[in-house]
Amino acid sequence: MSLRFIYGRAGSGKTRFCLEEIKSRITSKATHPLVLLVPEQFTFQAERDLISVLGTGGILKTEVLSFSRIAYRTFNEAGGITYPHIHSAGKCMILYRILDKMKGSFRVFSKTADRQGFVNTLSTLITEFKKYNVTPEDLEKVSKELEEDNPVKEKLMELTAIYDLFEKTIAERYRDPDDDLTLAAKKLGSIPLYDGAEIWIDGFTGFTPQEYQIIGQLMKKAQRVNISFCTDCLDGDLNDTDIFSSIKTAYRKLVKMAKENGIPVEPSVVLNSKPLFRFSQSPELSHLEQYLYAYPYKTYNEKTKDISLFSSVNIFAEVEACARDIVRLCRDRGMRYREIAVVTGNLDGYEKLIEAVFSEYGIPCFIDRKVDIVNHPLVRLIMSMLDIFIENWSYEAVFRYLKTGLTGIDRESIDRLENYVLACGIRGSCWTETEEWKMVPELIPNEKSLEEAKELLEDVNRIRAQVVAPLMEFRKKTKGRKKASDFCASLYDFLCTLGIPEKIEDAIEKFRESGNLNLANEYSQVWNAVMEVFDHTVEVMGDETFGIEKFARILEIGFGECKIGLIPASLDQVLVGSLERSRSHEIKALYILGANDGVFPPAVMEEGILSDQDRAVLNNAGIELASDTRTQAFDGQYLIYRALTTAGNYLRISWSIADHEGRTLRPSLVVFRLRKLFLNITETSNILPSGSLEEEMELLSGNSPAFKSMVSALRQKADGKEIKPVWQEAYRWFAVQDEWRGKCEALRAAFQYKNLAQPVSREKIAALYGEPAVSSVSRLEKYTACPFAFYVQYGLGAKERQIYSLRPPDVGTFMHAVIEKFSRMVAKRNISWRDLDRDWCSEKVSEIVDEMLEKMQGSGIAASRRYTALTLRLKRVVARAVWLIAEHIRRSSFEPVAYEVGFGENGKYPPIVIELDSGEKIHLTGRIDRVDALKTEDGTYLRIVDYKSGGKDFKLSDVFYGLQIQLITYLDALWESGEADENNPVLPGGVLYFKIDDPIIRGNGRMTEEEIEKAIMKQLRMKGLLLADVKLIREMDKDIEGSSMIIPATVNKDGSLGKNTSAATMEQFKLLRKYVRKLLKNLCEEIMKGNVSINPYKKKGTTSCKYCSFLPVCQFDTTMKENTFKLLYDKKDDEIWSLMAQEEEE
């Protein structure tokens, strides 16, 4: 029996020495057992290293073990191997159950016990207690010794209670894997296992008390225990700031243990001879290893070749640069992928990018990490399915479930169902009611839309039944409080009903066929992992009954503890790992990614349940635990040292100056240290590209990335910039390769592309719009705003996805419909508007609103029934509007003669027919909200009123440009229809917009109710264009004195019209009529020609693109010379009249 230490600095050959010694024992035909003991995560690599030294035959004579494997072997020999272990998921479930029972008695943990993640943190702490042999009795003893006012006392008491109950619960049926080493240490001495063995312990920086116990037993049994340590020396004073401090502490403990057991300590094997084995070919890396944390230090003055720094504009560019350099090393220096490693302090932030970019560059890589199953589609399916019942069939839960891809419903059906559900606001009991869905995704459905939706409803109800059936079958079995066994059995049946096991097998096969072995490996483990969680749930929760919400929480805790370990799919791969798991042998080149402040080294973890102060209290009481945050910070320096000294030939350290969101990042202090050590260190960057040929050539590191870089370069050439000839040569190469020829042709077409919409043929126009073509005046206004938007919306019939919500247009449409119903009721009952009573108006409006809301199923407005305030506001606004209409009519001699006057096949009037030069005819349809009339000796004056819920002003310049021609066109149609009657001709009285609104009146608090009403009336004054006839205007507002409160007119004291009057003479109305007719004809000519140009307008600070839904379709971009706005300018009315007159003369 003896103990021997093998030590040396990083790269000195400690592992190789151990392997060579094992080889020599095998060569000398030693009969005693040979054991190599390494950390759990490095066993696979250690076996590979052993094979490389010994060959496949030698590996059979040597055991590569970890501490947990030694425990397993011990139980196998001494008994206890069949004792049921509890998984970490089961431990967390037990802790959740304990916390749930004890939460009423907590004071310290009363607020944190229910927080997500607390159970996992508590489980980690208990694991730490066990690794350091701390029992509940130890904690209780310390808590009793503390003063009553000590804040740690109560925390320790609560932890003791939790820990003690946990231990008792575990002892009933299980064994905690965290106890294995303690139990194994007790049994190891009584069995012959490893008697006379020679053991090499390699790769550790320190040990837990449990591991010390195992080592102590091995010392007593083995003929020799060899322990290798990475350190400069073993003696000397301990200093917390020494990067080898934890190793020297471990050495002292082991020596003390050996002496206590009478085991001799042999002279140490020192491997610090210069140059160190690993760095024999690189003086630079040797200098780095020697002086990284040395004070004082020597500088390296020559230009570095093996060490370089690289700063990148962002993380993606950093990973790309790394991939290009790896390709360069393999191509120019003959390195193998397995000789290269990538290490980062932020693996979570880099791993997806590394996978994607390395794949593009054809670099095989293995990312050394364990995969959480929480985000696996199978787990998301289970949790979202449970959420459906917990959240009462919320939209989010249902479609999280459906979009896992495991339900057996195709994506097209899911999309169709989702569109319907969003449009109709389906939720809650709507999913489970026995009646089929009959809601129509339309604001105010009519008979025609109901008929058209028949096919949609049949399809949607079929999909709905397919979705609901298995879910309701599961819910029927799990309604109310059930045992875990009932829940898990029902859940298993549910998964089998969906055919999940078969789907998982199919996915594994597809991944294997496509060469994606990592995903195949992951999927092959996930089903078993889920089944294990079910088993633990049943075992832990026993006969306790609970509801579905608690069951979901238990599963969530269980899945959160499940991680899948992956193994490399091939031998020749780049190893990618975190700073903590960066150990690897025979690495020639190392890339450090993300060498940023706070990442390299990683920021110290939060203190957790026990703060540094709490740990200090326990330490003073003789209880040893894991290191505090201060010690962890110093340990971080050792991690940096170990990482930077991993490679023997090449080291490249890179960092980004900005993250994904553009926030500034600082380089790590390590970077500044390297700049001090190496005064002439090679440093490059892609922040400001030099454009040199060498730099451009680096971009040709792989076909796919080279093609992308070539596209970027050729784009610059197309923009008139100079590029290197290499890119034209690259294009010629790609163009003759079969794999890339098609892409080059597409590229050529792309560079010739102009964002222009080509005219549509007459045949297609006829097919889209019919023969004769039918449109509306409002649509022609849309065509004026942008021909392409008109074509997409009305020609192709594109629509925005309807969302079940109350938007301003919905409110406006609804209020418009209420006023229409009210107006028809007044006319039907033959009631004069002048006789209406305000209370009666409010009462009838309220009845109409309630009646419409009752009928409106599946529209956004229907939801307002649940919001009393909104319903009341609708009633108030519409009641005010009808009362204001009545007040306008009372003040006027004009009488309403028609409501909702339609132009078209089923309207009161025939469609407005526009005959084109080609002989083609276009029928324009439309609807007038209200027509008022006044009979005089000269004829009947008509006034058209249009109700608007938004702010709509009348601008003559907008009429001139074609943006506001609707009311003038309607007036013209009525005017023309009445011109034939010579005895009573129809004459234009005006066109007006009536605003439906609930304005806020700003004034002092002393305003009377009458003053408030006047202010509201003035604010809601109609806007538009009137006939410039004082007599007629007085008929429109009999109370007018100065500025009218109801129409856009002012009468001066001398009886003339004021300058603020919006009016036109009879001649001007005739001119306007002719101009609009000509404008309509021109617009229709352009439509029938197939002009669908992307030509939006810009007027002052607004454009027709501002609220356009089709911008992603047209991709209008002002940086492209062919994409320009049609510039419109507001002009004075006199100038507009003059321009119209000029048009007429032409």
Curated annotation (Swiss-Prot):
Pfam families: ADDB_N (PF21445), PDDEXK_1 (PF12705), UvrD_C (PF13361). SUPFAM superfamilies: P-loop containing nucleoside triphosphate hydrolases, Restriction endonuclease-like. Residues 1-280 form the UvrD-like helicase ATP-binding domain. Binds 1 [4Fe-4S] cluster. GO terms for biological process: double-strand break repair via homologous recombination. Keywords: 4Fe-4S, ATP-binding, DNA damage, DNA repair, DNA-binding, Exonuclease, Helicase, Hydrolase, Iron, Iron-sulfur, Metal-binding, Nuclease, Nucleotide-binding. ATP binds at G8, R9, A10, G11, S12, G13, K14, T15. Residues 276-584 form the UvrD-like helicase C-terminal domain. One of its GO terms (molecular function) is ATP binding. InterPro entries: ADDB_N, DNA_helicase_suAddB, DNA_helicase_UvrD-like_C, P-loop_NTPase, PDDEXK-like_dom_sf, PDDEXK_AddAB-type, Restrct_endonuc-II-like. Transmembrane segments: none annotated. It comes from the Bacteria. Its EC number is 3.1.-.-. It is an enzyme of class 3 (hydrolase). Its cofactor is Mg(2+); [4Fe-4S] cluster. [4Fe-4S] cluster binds at C786, C1105, C1108, C1114. Belongs to the helicase family. AddB/RexB type 1 subfamily. The heterodimer acts as both an ATP-dependent DNA helicase and an ATP-dependent, dual-direction single-stranded exonuclease. Recognizes the chi site generating a DNA molecule suitable for the initiation of homologous recombination. The AddB subunit has 5' -> 3' nuclease activity but not helicase activity. HAMAP family: AddB_type1 (MF_01452). Heterodimer of AddA and AddB. Despite having conserved helicase domains, this subunit does not have helicase activity. This is ATP-dependent helicase/deoxyribonuclease subunit B. It comes from Acetivibrio thermocellus (strain ATCC 27405 / DSM 1237 / JCM 9322 / NBRC 103400 / NCIMB 10682 / NRRL B-4536 / VPI 7372) (Clostridium thermocellum).
